[in-house]
Amino acid sequence: MSNTQLLEVLGTETFDVQEDLFAFDTTDTTIVASNDDPDTRFKSWSLCTPGCARTGSFNSYCC
């Protein structure tokens, strides 16, 4: 079914749809500045109990 036929089935106003309507432009590039250090953007902390798999604590995997 062509794009125009699909528009007729949906009951909308028909018009000529080009085939490249849904084509994606893959030539865009992302430039990351040299001072954009990923270590400054992402931080994580972990809090572990001293149980170390002996207490059955939910975070005893930290050992």
From Swiss-Prot:
<feature type="cross-link" description="S-(2-aminovinyl)-D-cysteine (Ser-Cys)">
    <location>
        <begin position="60"/>
        <end position="63"/>
    </location>
</feature>
<dbReference type="GO" id="GO:0005576">
    <property type="term" value="C:extracellular region"/>
</dbReference>
<protein>
    <recommendedName>
        <fullName>Lantibiotic mutacin-1140</fullName>
    </recommendedName>
</protein>
<feature type="cross-link" description="Beta-methyllanthionine (Thr-Cys)">
    <location>
        <begin position="49"/>
        <end position="52"/>
    </location>
</feature>
<keyword id="KW-0044">Antibiotic</keyword>
<dbReference type="GO" id="GO:0031640">
    <property type="term" value="P:killing of cells of another organism"/>
</dbReference>
<keyword id="KW-0883">Thioether bond</keyword>
<feature type="propeptide">
    <location>
        <begin position="1"/>
        <end position="41"/>
    </location>
</feature>
<comment type="function">
    <text>Lanthionine-containing peptide antibiotic (lantibiotic) active on Gram-positive bacteria. The bactericidal activity of lantibiotics is based on depolarization of energized bacterial cytoplasmic membranes, initiated by the formation of aqueous transmembrane pores.</text>
</comment>
<feature type="cross-link" description="Lanthionine (Ser-Cys)">
    <location>
        <begin position="44"/>
        <end position="48"/>
    </location>
</feature>
<keyword id="KW-0425">Lantibiotic</keyword>
<keyword id="KW-0929">Antimicrobial</keyword>
<dbReference type="Pfam" id="PF02052">
    <property type="entry name" value="Gallidermin"/>
</dbReference>
<keyword id="KW-0078">Bacteriocin</keyword>
<dbReference type="GO" id="GO:0042742">
    <property type="term" value="P:defense response to bacterium"/>
</dbReference>
<feature type="modified residue" description="2,3-didehydrobutyrine">
    <location>
        <position position="55"/>
    </location>
</feature>
<feature type="cross-link" description="Lanthionine (Ser-Cys)">
    <location>
        <begin position="57"/>
        <end position="62"/>
    </location>
</feature>
<dbReference type="InterPro" id="IPR006079">
    <property type="entry name" value="Lantibiotic_typ-A_Bacillales"/>
</dbReference>
<comment type="similarity">
    <text>Belongs to the type A lantibiotic family.</text>
</comment>
<feature type="modified residue" description="2,3-didehydroalanine (Ser)">
    <location>
        <position position="46"/>
    </location>
</feature>
<keyword id="KW-0208">D-amino acid</keyword>
<dbReference type="GO" id="GO:0005102">
    <property type="term" value="F:signaling receptor binding"/>
</dbReference>
